[in-house]
């Protein structure tokens, strides 16, 4: 005797039962709308119809989606990044199918921003090129543009019809004040640019493991911004379907509540001040240990990193002789320097540089 077939009705019913439950545990492709609104307000200082966004897999994921968007819709299929820049920018954009070009940012010899070089390169680029800009706490140099320099960059980008793309991975880390750190983004919004922005919550909210980010676009109007976001969704769906839910709820809890937000702002200042005090301590210890090199740049720089000026050989010697690890371009994470290890680090740096 053959077994009875299961009823179709049963299958239909189970779909009805499970569908709403599944739905409750999923974010839509674009992510959590409450989080996107909070993120937009955090960066731009306001919400507006012509600013729309999607939740992303942290800063890296947002960069990749924007790179793919450029590859699909931007006629030039290239992007200018500062020299130097965060090492991962280059493969992210290359893997998205773009040609990566560099614009001058840092004067390695004099350890300061090469502003003339930057302006010359923006001027020389074809009209309508896309430029990646670090919104604050430039990684790895720790040197940001002044207000006046940002205004000049905004002017030239408007004149050349360039497309700005801000990467904001350290809001709150540069000055200790999240509002101040958003000033370049807000200036460009005020000045009427159309532009993209990717935000990471890895460092400022300590959410590295949760992959929390937001990719937003300032369109000429709401219709344009919504059309771009719809294309972002078209890229997200075949990449990872939809983003995770947990980390954004932490952000919503904090940024959606005035007293929690005030606490975050205070703690951010505390953290930025601690890093700055470690810069001073590191230099004081270097001088005390007998180093005659000029270390002024370490205290002039801001953000999480010291672009120390150590050569590749010196970095390797520090690793081999003292078990101190930093990137081969000499970038030291100041977040790892404490009152307990600062003397050891200074002695080790002096040992490999004397
Ligand atoms: N942009 C910059 C400039 C960064 O330094 C980083 C992280 N080091 C990121 C983006 C991406 O970080 P995440 O993917 O962890 O948000």
Label every PLM stretch briefly.
Residues 2-15, 19, 23-161, 171-185, ...:
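Conserved core of the PLP fold type I
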Residues 28, 198, 295-300, 325-327:
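Short beta-strand
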Residues 168:
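Walker B catalytic acidic pair
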Residues 100, 164, 195, 325-326:
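Hydrophobic beta-strand scaffold residues
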Residues 181-227, 231:
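Active-site PLP attachment segment
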Residues 263-321:
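Conserved PLP-binding catalytic core of the aspartate aminotransferase-like
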Residues 229-248, 254-283:
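Structural signature of PLP-dependent enzymes
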Residues 35, 62, 209, 247-250:
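Catalytic-loop motifs flanking and including active-site residues across diverse enzymes
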């Amino acid at each position: 005797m053959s077994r009875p077939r299961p009823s179709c009705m049963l299958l239909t019913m189970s779909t009805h039962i499970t569908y709403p439950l599944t739905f409750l545990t999923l974010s839509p492709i674009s992510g959590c709308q409450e989080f996107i609104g909070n993120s937009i307000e955090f960066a731009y200082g306001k919400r507006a119809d012509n600013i729309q966004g999607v939740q992303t897999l942290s800063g890296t994921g947002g960069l990749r989606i924007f790179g793919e968007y450029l590859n699909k819709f931007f006629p030039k299929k290239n992007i200018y990044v500062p020299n130097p820049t965060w090492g991962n920018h280059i493969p992210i954009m290359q893997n998205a199918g773009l040609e990566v070009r560099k614009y001058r940012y840092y004067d390695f010899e004099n350890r300061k921003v090469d502003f003339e070089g930057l302006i010359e390169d923006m001027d020389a680029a074809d009209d309508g090129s896309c430029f990646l800009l670090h919104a604050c706490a430039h990684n790895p140099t720790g040197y940001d543009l002044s207000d006046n320099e940002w205004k000049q960059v905004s002017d030239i980008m408007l004149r050349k019809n360039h497309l700005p793309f801000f990467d904001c991975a350290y809001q709150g880390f540069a000055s200790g004040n999240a509002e101040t750190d958003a000033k370049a983004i807000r200036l460009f919004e005020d000045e009427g640019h159309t532009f993209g922005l990717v935000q990471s919550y890895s460092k400022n909210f300590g959410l590295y493991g949760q992959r929390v980010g937001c990719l937003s676009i300032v369109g000429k109007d709401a219709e344009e911004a919504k059309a771009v976001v719809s294309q972002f969704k078209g890229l997200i769906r075949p990449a990872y379907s939809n983003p995770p839910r947990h980390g954004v709820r932490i952000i919503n809890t904090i940024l959606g509540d005035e007293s929690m937000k005030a606490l975050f702002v205070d703690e951010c200042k505390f953290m930025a001040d601690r890093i700055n005090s470690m810069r001073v301590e590191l230099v004081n210890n270097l001088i005390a240990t007998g180093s005659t090199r000029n270390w002024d740049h370490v205290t002039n720089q801001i953000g999480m990193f010291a672009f120390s000026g150590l050569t590749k050989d010196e970095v390797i010697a520090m690793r081999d002789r003292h078990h101190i690890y930093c990137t081969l371009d000499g970038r030291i994470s100041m977040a790892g320097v404490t009152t307990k290890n600062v003397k050891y680090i200074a002695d080790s740096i002096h040992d490999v540089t004397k």
